[in-house]
Structure formats: C-alpha cells, structure tokens
Regions:
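A structural motif corresponding to the C-terminal end of an alpha-helix
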Residues: 28, 48, 72-82, 125-144
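Glycine/Thr-rich beta-alpha phosphate-binding loop at enzyme active sites
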Residues: 90, 94-179
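Active-site mouth loops of central-metabolism enzymes
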Residues: 54-67, 118, 122
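Structural preference for beta-strand elements that scaffold enzyme active sites
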Residues: 1-21, 28-30, 53-58, 83-87, ...
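The feature marks a conserved, polyanion-engaging helical scaffold used by nucleic-acid processing enzymes
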Residues: 68-95, 99-105
Length: 179
C-alpha cells in the first residue's frame, strides 16, 4: 500500500478504512474474484490471501520536515502495526554531488534548482531519523526501510506542462543511478 501525505490525512476515516480493507479483504474478495473471472476464469483456482498487504510505503510532500516524516512512520509502525517504508529524495546527496552525477557523469541536461535542496531533508537529518525508525520497527516487531529514489524537483523544461508551471518532478529510470 502507499499512503500520504500527512498524518492528519492518514488518520482520516477514509484512509483508515482503506488500510483496514487491504489488511483484511475477506469481505471484498468474492466480488473481486467474480469480476476478474469474467475475463479470466482461472482466477477461481488461485488462492488469494485475505490479507493482501501488511506493508505501507509512506509518501510525503517535498519539504516535509524530517520530524513530521518520523512522526508519521512511528504512527504506522506502532499504532497501525504495519511494516513501513519511507520515500526519500535524491537531494540527500547534496547539490554538488547530485548535480555532478546527474549532469556530468550521466549526461542529463536537467536543472535542479537550489530550492529543491532547501526544503527536502538533509542527509545529516535523515540518517539519525532512519536509525531511530529502524529501532522503532525492531521494537514493534515490524520491518522498516527506505526508498531513495522518490522524485526529484527539476526546472520545467518540457512543453508537456504549461509555461507557468516552473517546476516538474522527475521520476523513474533516470533516478536509479542516483540511488
């Protein structure tokens, strides 16, 4: 599962219902199997567990402070009781290293604005947070991990977006080497 973007939203009845329905889908499975069986009857022979997932990936907005990320992840680990992964951004590398890799080493002509580094967590803030969350997960009998290639804020250089949109968010394969 993937949830976000802030603790208030994650604690909302709608998101809590979604999490509960994925953790225990026994009431919804018969109708879902019937629907899929119309296109693929073999689905009836597949053993589908009622618990579809006990794992959550936390997405937060760019600029979310490390303390808030940690608060949300602790809530998911301790109160909801799910294995939790936190998405972090390549800006953890810092401006010189990230731009050097992206532009010089890999040859991408992409401009990463200074602002992208100003509002995302810094490596020196993220590392202690990750260590504390790993300990929280161990104490709760859960797993904790990070995804280091979430998205990267870059200057809008493509005609796909309106000119008034000054930034766009890069994702996918280009970020894998940065990870």
């Amino acid at each position: 599962m993937s949830v976000g973007y802030n603790l208030e939203g994650i604690q909302s009845p709608r998101v809590q219902k979604y999490i509960a329905s994925v953790r225990d889908a026994k009431d919804a499975l018969p109708a879902a199997v019937d629907a899929v069986a119309k296109a693929w009857p073999g689905v009836r022979d597949v053993e589908i567990p009622a618990s579809l997932s006990e794992h959550i990936t936390l997405s937060t907005m760019h600029g979310c402070p490390p303390a808030e990320i940690e608060r949300i992840a602790r809530y998911l680990l301790e109160e909801v009781g799910v294995h939790t992964w936190v998405k972090l951004n390549p800006t953890l590398l810092g401006p010189e290293r990230l731009r050097g890799l992206l532009n010089s080493t890999f040859g991408y002509g992409i401009e990463v604005p200074d602002a992208a580094f100003g509002h995302d967590p810094k490596f020196e803030d993220a590392l202690p947070m990750v260590k504390r969350l790993a300990e929280t997960a161990r104490a709760a009998g859960r797993e904790f991990g990070v995804k280091l290639s979430n998205t990267l804020e870059v200057v809008n250089h493509r005609p796909v977006f309106p000119p008034h949109e000054k930034m766009m968010y890069m994702s996918g394969r280009a970020l894998h080497p940065l990870t």
